[in-house]
Amino acid sequence: MKHRDTYILFLFLFNFCTYLWSQDSNGKTRRIEIVYGGEFTIDNVKYPGATIFKSDGQRVQFRHQGLDVWCDLAVLYEERNEVIAHGKVVLQQGDTLQMNSQYISYKGNTKTAVAREGVVLRNGNMTLETEELFFDRNKQEAY
């Protein structure tokens, strides 16, 4: 039991101090920062290889190169460089783009996101509502 607790503590600290894979403007490897994780668990049966972060009153938050995401539950796959966010998800890029939904899958390697369930995208004066939306940060396109 003691080794398990040590492993979980190490994993928790590791996730808060490191980043997932992605490319920055210099072509160097970068990682997604877990800003706040709340409660965390590991469930290798349901989410093999993932760390699960759950709100503890304060929302789970992660950040990647000018993109912030808040949610109630985040499933972090370090090997796949992917975060899946569930429950009242808010994606904010800079001060102009905001997307709300119930689910977002964000891939750091490709800087792409898929949002589902009650998606509302706001960019300046434009508002788009749909049930599914793909967002490519490299091209700054949503479709």
Predicted regions, residues:
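Bacterial Sec-dependent N-terminal signal peptides
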Residues: 1-26
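N-terminal amphipathic/hydrophobic interface segments
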Residues: 21-143
